[in-house]
Curated annotation (Swiss-Prot):
Belongs to the adenoviridae E3B family. Its main location: host cell. Keywords: Early protein, Host endoplasmic reticulum, Host membrane, Membrane, Signal, Transmembrane, Transmembrane helix. Residues 23-34 are lumenal. It comes from Human adenovirus C serotype 6. This is Early E3B 10.4 kDa protein. It is a single-pass type I membrane protein.
Amino acid sequence: MIPRVLILLTLVALFCACSTLAAVAHIEVDCIPPFTVYLLYGFVTLILICSLVTVVIAFIQFIDWICVRIAYLRHHPQYRDRTIADLLRIL
């Protein structure tokens, strides 16, 4: 079972990126002063970079979770501890 936090974190980041791009797509730049347009596009770039970094971090956490699960399951059954498995949400 994949931890729900990783899925939620990825979905929130993708939602932020998509909603930001959708909001910017409907802006008429002819009606706004140049400084405001540059400021707006700066914020859009910042939001997209933060969303991308969040998705990358969530992906790295997912890979780490898989590696921990594989390493735990490779141990001999007599050394497996059920409380640690519950803590790591492995089984």
